[in-house]
């Protein structure tokens, strides 16, 4: 929780951040970012949402050196048959009625794709290019590749000069993960007996 993060920062004597950016407070910036990608010819609309058109890039992927033809379309999400390319990714999604989080947008009630949040907020707070972007190794092949693609479509630049990725923490003879139910936070560790 945010309270745990703030408390951990204080207990570890880490300098407090100048800004704490919440994605839900930046919906207008995300909508504007998506519209700019459409205007620049890097995105298009289907009946299910707005997709980034990877065919517009001179190189994709950039960071992972993977062969895109080895990817399995639809491995994580259902394939939208209206997509121009199976590897085009959603940047804005038209919300089904039962979707909890949704906002008014030029495309109806909808919500941001996973990658657009980071691109819009980093552009707002850090500018078109910044020094270091960090994340887990699991973000390289999809999330960070797509952030780069969006930034290239919006500004013509790769957003970060340096990309640094951390490996997974190991716990109980395996990867630690929130979804695996074995994640330990600093708050949990210093409150345990």
What is the role of each PLM region?
Residues 7, 28-193:
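Alpha-helical recognition segments enriched in aromatics with Gly/Pro capping
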Residues 3-4:
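Active-site loops and adjacent core secondary-structure elements that bind or stabilize anionic groups
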């Amino acid at each position: 929780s945010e309270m745990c993060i703030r408390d951990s920062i204080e207990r570890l004597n880490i300098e407090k951040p100048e800004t704490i950016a919440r994605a839900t407070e930046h919906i207008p910036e995300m909508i504007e970012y998506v519209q700019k990608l459409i205007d620049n010819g890097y995105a298009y609309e289907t009946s299910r949402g707005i997709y980034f058109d990877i065919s517009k890039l001179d190189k994709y992927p950039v960071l992972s050196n993977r062969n895109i033809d080895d990817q399995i379309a639809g491995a994580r999400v259902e394939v939208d048959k209206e997509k121009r390319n199976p590897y085009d990714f959603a940047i804005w999604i038209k919300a089904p009625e039962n979707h909890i989080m949704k906002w008014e947008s030029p495309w109806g009630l909808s919500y941001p794709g996973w990658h657009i949040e980071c691109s819009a907020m980093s552009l707002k707070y850090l500018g078109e290019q910044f020094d270091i972007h960090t994340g887990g190794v699991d973000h390289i092949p999809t999330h960070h590749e797509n952030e780069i693609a969006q930034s290239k479509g919006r500004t013509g630049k790769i957003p970060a000069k340096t990309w640094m990725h951390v490996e997974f923490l190991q716990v109980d003879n395996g990867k630690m993960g929130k979804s695996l139910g074995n994640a330990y936070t600093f708050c949990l560790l210093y409150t345990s007996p």
